[in-house]
A protein has these predicted regions:
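Core catalytic region of metal-dependent phosphoesterases/phosphodiesterases
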Residues: 2-6, 10, 15-112
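Short hydrophobic-aromatic micro-motifs
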Residues: 9, 116-120, 126-127
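A residue-level structural signature of the nucleotidyltransferase/glycosyltransferase Rossmann-like core
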Residues: 109, 116-117, 136
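Active-site-proximal loop/helix segment associated with metal-binding centers of metalloenzymes
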Residues: 122-145
Length: 145
C-alpha cells in the first residue's frame, strides 16, 4: 500500500452561482473530488465553495448532493477535509462538522510535509472596511445563528 501524502487546496468554486450551466459546474467539481488519488491525505476547502450558503439550526440549502457524496466518499477513505468559511459561505453552523469535516473560521498555520503554510480564505486579510467588519460581527451573534 502506498503512503498517503498528497494535500489539495480548493477555493472560490461558487456553487449555485447563476452561470450558463450551474448543474455542470457542480458535476465537474464532484468529478474532481471523486478523482483525487488514493494517496490523498487532506483536502482544504478555502472558502466560497458555495456562492451563497445560509444554514439554519435544522435546515440546510437544498441540492449539491453530488458534491456532498463525493466529500463523504473522500472522508470514508480516510481523507481529512477542512472547511474554511469564506465571505459567501459564512453562515455555516454545524452541518459540515456533522458530516465529518473540520470547520475553521480563522486563518491558521499548518505544517504539511515539514513545511509551514498560512491558510485561510483571505477576505479578512489586509485593510477591512468598517461596514464589512460590522456585518461579519453581526452574523456571528448567537441571536442571528
Amino acid at each position: 500500500m502506498r503512503e498517503k501524502h498528497l494535500t489539495y487546496f480548493v477555493s472560490d468554486v461558487h456553487l449555485g452561482l447563476q452561470v450558463a450551466d450551474p448543474a455542470g459546474r457542480e458535476r465537474r467539481f464532484a468529478d474532481f473530488l471523486g478523482n483525487l488519488p488514493g494517496e490523498t491525505e487532506a483536502l482544504y476547502l478555502l472558502g466560497d465553495i458555495w456562492d451563497f450558503w445560509y444554514e439554519y439550526r435544522d435546515v440546510v440549502p437544498k441540492g449539491y448532493v453530488r458534491v456532498f457524496a463525493a466529500l463523504q466518499q473522500l472522508m470514508d477513505r480516510g481523507v481529512k477535509v477542512y472547511f474554511f468559511q469564506g465571505n459567501h459561505d459564512v453562515w455555516t453552523y454545524s452541518y459540515f462538522e456533522e458530516l465529518g469535516m473540520v470547520k475553521l473560521t480563522q486563518p491558521c498555520v499548518v505544517e504539511i510535509q515539514g513545511k509551514r503554510f498560512c491558510l485561510g480564505h483571505g477576505d479578512g486579510l489586509g485593510p477591512v472596511p468598517f461596514g464589512y467588519r460590522f456585518l461579519r460581527g453581526l452574523f456571528a451573534l448567537p441571536l442571528l445563528s
